[in-house]
């Protein structure tokens, strides 16, 4: 059977998609890039917030149109939306032939076989309690780079978030298992591993009180052929001195940290159940900049949380201005069904949320531009990912994470190989991107 995929949401979901693709290929199916050629399509959904749910449902309904044209026979909804709503999705969307949760994505082949025999399938567990995935993956990332999901689930209880109720409690993967997967990825030509989880810094907390992340990073650093290790989704509360030391002293661990702070007002952070305050964030950032040379910091902030007054927004704005993050993502609070924050008083109007988000993003745009301008006339190692034209390639430096940050456009008269590193002279800036030359 020809099977196509639509993968929505975060990088963790992308990894699940890659595991499902490999499992189906192993079972004898063909993975196709064109949905028009597919007999069956799997839409791997996101159920984190309402806009993501709406995008997922829209993708399912749009794909269902292919069934009416006769080119598509079967349609499966997988991922967080399916895990969250289960059989309700089957009832609401009659075009669906199956709903598949997140508890064991490598078992997708059995579900596909049941659907092919005419059964409508709902395959979910109430709350996943184990981490099952140990199989191979078909990579969907650009050459040279891959995500490594080190754990599943989350033990935090942020008041705006429903992920623990969907993905379950924290389940860390064994270090040997991760090292084996990393070795497989290196054999496929991977040179950068991007470590992801719901909470990367909490890796190992379900096994012992101490984070096992420093040990994992040191072991990964011993692998021949691996050049970059990048850390994403670090919680400010668990960023220990041991983690900082590894980032500072292990050459393969990039001086790049993605630390979503969500807010800088102690009042709002308390309402969010983040368990740290403004003072903790200031101390953390000062320590990081003092101990890690050439550090790149990325963060995420939320605007319009219930009870966010002008003074709270002003505190966040001032904090962003002072902290000088290299990259920043911003999104407006959504009162998510099932979250504690949805029931809080003093909900903020959408117009005010949008205004505050726009102000923060305009501030960050100026900061990022100034930081990029300061990089002109420096030389950086660039991982080449694609080619735009005969003399123009696209890649990333250590200070640019895949999918979320800017890129580096490389001008050259040479033929560069995708997935290779080259030393590039940075000569200009275009929006959020760098312009470089390779001679």
Curated annotation (Swiss-Prot):
Residues 1-117 form the MTTase N-terminal domain. Belongs to the methylthiotransferase family. RimO subfamily. GO terms for biological process: tRNA modification. This is Ribosomal protein uS12 methylthiotransferase RimO. It comes from Syntrophomonas wolfei subsp. wolfei (strain DSM 2245B / Goettingen). The lineage of its organism: Bacteria, Bacillati, Bacillota, Clostridia, Eubacteriales. [4Fe-4S] cluster 1 binds at residues 10, 46, 80. The gene is rimO. It is an enzyme of class 2 (transferase). Catalyzes the methylthiolation of an aspartic acid residue of ribosomal protein uS12. Keywords: 4Fe-4S, Cytoplasm, Iron, Iron-sulfur, Metal-binding, S-adenosyl-L-methionine, Transferase.
């Amino acid at each position: 059977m020809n099977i196509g995929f639509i993968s929505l949401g975060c990088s963790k979901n992308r990894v699940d998609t890659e595991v499902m693709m490999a499992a189906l290929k192993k079972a004898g199916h063909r993975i196709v890039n064109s949905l028009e050629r597919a007999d069956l399509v799997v839409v791997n959904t996101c159920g984190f917030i309402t806009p993501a749910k709406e995008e997922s449902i829209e993708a399912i309904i749009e794909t269902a149109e292919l069934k009416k044209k006769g080119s598509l026979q079967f349609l499966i909804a997988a991922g967080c939306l399916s895990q969250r709503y289960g059989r309700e999705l089957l009832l609401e969307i009659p075009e669906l032939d199956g709903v598949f949760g997140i508890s064991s994505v490598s078992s997708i082949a059995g579900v596909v076989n049941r659907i092919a025999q005419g059964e409508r399938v709902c395959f979910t567990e109430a709350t996943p309690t184990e981490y099952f995935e140990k199989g191979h993956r078909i990579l969907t990332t650009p050459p040279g780079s891959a995500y490594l999901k080190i754990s599943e689930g989350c033990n935090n209880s942020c008041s705006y978030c429903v992920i623990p109720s969907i993905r379950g409690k924290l389940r860390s993967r064994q270090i040997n298992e991760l090292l084996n997967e990393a070795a497989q990825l290196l054999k496929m030509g991977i040179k950068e591993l991007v470590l992801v989880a719901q909470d990367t810094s909490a890796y190992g907390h379900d096994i012992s009180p101490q984070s096992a992340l420093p040990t994992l990073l040191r072991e990964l650093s011993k692998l021949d052929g691996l050049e970059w290790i990048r850390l994403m989704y670090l919680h400010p509360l668990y960023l220990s001195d041991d983690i900082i030391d590894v980032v500072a002293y292990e050459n393969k661990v990039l001086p790049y940290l993605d630390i979503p702070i969500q807010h800088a007002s102690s009042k709002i952070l308390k309402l969010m159940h983040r368990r740290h305050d403004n003072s903790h964030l200031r101390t953390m950032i000062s320590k990081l900049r003092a101990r890690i040379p050439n550090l790149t910091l990325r963060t995420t902030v939320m605007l319009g949380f219930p009870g966010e007054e002008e003074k709270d927004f002003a505190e966040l704005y001032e904090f962003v201005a002072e902290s000088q993050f290299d990259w920043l993502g911003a999104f407006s609070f959504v009162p998510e069904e099932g979250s504690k924050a949805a029931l809080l008083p003093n909900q903020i109007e959408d117009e005010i949320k949008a205004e505050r988000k726009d102000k923060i993003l305009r501030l960050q745009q100026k900061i990022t531009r100034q930081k990029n301008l300061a990089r002109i006339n420096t030389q950086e190692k660039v991982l080449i990912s694609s080619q735009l034209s005969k003399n123009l390639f696209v890649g990333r430096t250590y200070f640019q994470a895949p999918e979320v940050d800017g890129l580096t456009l490389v001008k050259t008269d040479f033929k560069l190989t995708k997935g290779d590193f080259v030393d590039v002279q940075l000569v200009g800036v275009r929006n959020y991107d760098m312009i470089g030359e390779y001679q």
